[in-house]
Amino acid sequence: MAAASSSRVLLAAVAVLAAALAGCGAGAALDDPAGLLRRAKEAEFAGWMVGLRRRIHENPELGYEEFATSELVRRELDALGIPYRHPFAVTGVVATVGTGGPPFVALRADMDALPMQESVEWEHKSKVPGKMHGCGHDAHVAMLLGSARILQEHRDELKGTVVLVFQPAEEGGGGAKKMIDDGTVENIEAIFGVHVADVVPIGVVASRPGPVMAGSGFFEAVISGKGGHAALPHHTIDPILAASNVIVSLQQLVSREADPLDSQVVTVGKFQGGGAFNVIPDSVTIGGTFRAFLKESFNQLKQRIEEVIVSQASVQRCNAVVDFLDKDRPFFPPTINSAGLHDFFVKVASEMVGPKNVRDKQPLMGAEDFAFYADAIPATYYYFLGMYNETRGPQAPHHSPYFTINEDALPYGAALQASLATRYLLEHQPPTTGKAKAHDEL
């Protein structure tokens, strides 16, 4: 009787344990996106990501200054037992999970903040005056660490290698290009990037094949004339008048020279000159940005911007010097999504959130340095992760001092990035041959 009783107790304990494991997302199959989402939504897991995101948010760092953020990333990777290499592009970190051999697929998160003062009053407000995570990069880092944790839980099941790229300086600093120049993406076949979106509903993802974000460049011009008294304009050469004509003429580049079906933008956002009501200054500085989806259109805009500024200044008897600032702010190419990866993304995302929650996204004239990876990696894909919830009230836009993150989005980002990587490895196994061959190392 004692033996039988002990057996029943043991069987009951086994049943309880099995039930617990069945309800635990950690036991989700690697090829089950919905199961990985359940894992990421578990209270402890989601709370861990929220904590990471808030710590990063409290201590924002600008491009190439992300030393504390990089240290946090490395500390968490150490805790997870994930190997990494550091530094790349000053503060960047590259980690790997899996076999160490092909195929290689990458996931990327940007780490930098913005030079702006946070206006949201809450417990985890930025502690650094004049700096704020106003674009969601704190969430991106937390989600990629969440993906890392999921992948590490399944490391023995991975059929290749997932490369985790924690990148500095997306906000105008061209951090992606410097990461590439430092050799971080060799042998990688595909890379996925994600951005939280303030206008896309929570639980919804959105993207499109082909151009998804525009190429971007900046320009600055110094227009020089001859200063003097405002009451004697005939003794001066007025650079303010010249700059005004330049600005009007620049607007004709899009309205009269660009194909209406080929979206382009030229915007002058900077005008500095003069400091007194009755003085015509010696010079004026103007500056702005230009955007296009096609490389040919982008290059044409660049050429014509310089021609128009120099020529129009000359008409007003002024001289102009144009600087495209590409040494400090490299031109961002258009972000182009691989058509093949789009079909793949739709399939995997539909399994996680349902087909109705995978939506088309109109191209944006904003720019993203994720585009640089297309110069070094055969297939690239960038998508948007919804976080809008009407019950939270109005959502301030990105780059606003009132911007906030709906932290309920973090599990979706962590699980989907992990699912995209693992499924990519499964579907892109190298062909087998009769003779064993040594794997290429990353």
UniProtKB/Swiss-Prot annotation:
Keywords: Endoplasmic reticulum, Hydrolase, Signal. It is an enzyme of class 3 (hydrolase). Gene3D superfamilies: 3.30.70.360, Zn peptidases. PROSITE patterns: ER_TARGET. CDD domains: M20_IAA_Hyd. InterPro entries: Amidohydrolase, Bact_exopeptidase_dim_dom, ILR1-like_Hyd, Peptidase_M20, Peptidase_M20_dimer. It holds the Pfam family M20_dimer. The keyword Hydrolase applies. The lineage of its organism: Eukaryota, Viridiplantae, Streptophyta, Embryophyta, Tracheophyta. This is IAA-amino acid hydrolase ILR1-like 1. It comes from the Eukaryota. GO terms for molecular function: IAA-Ala conjugate hydrolase activity. The gene is ILL1. Belongs to the peptidase M20 family. The keyword Hydrolase applies.
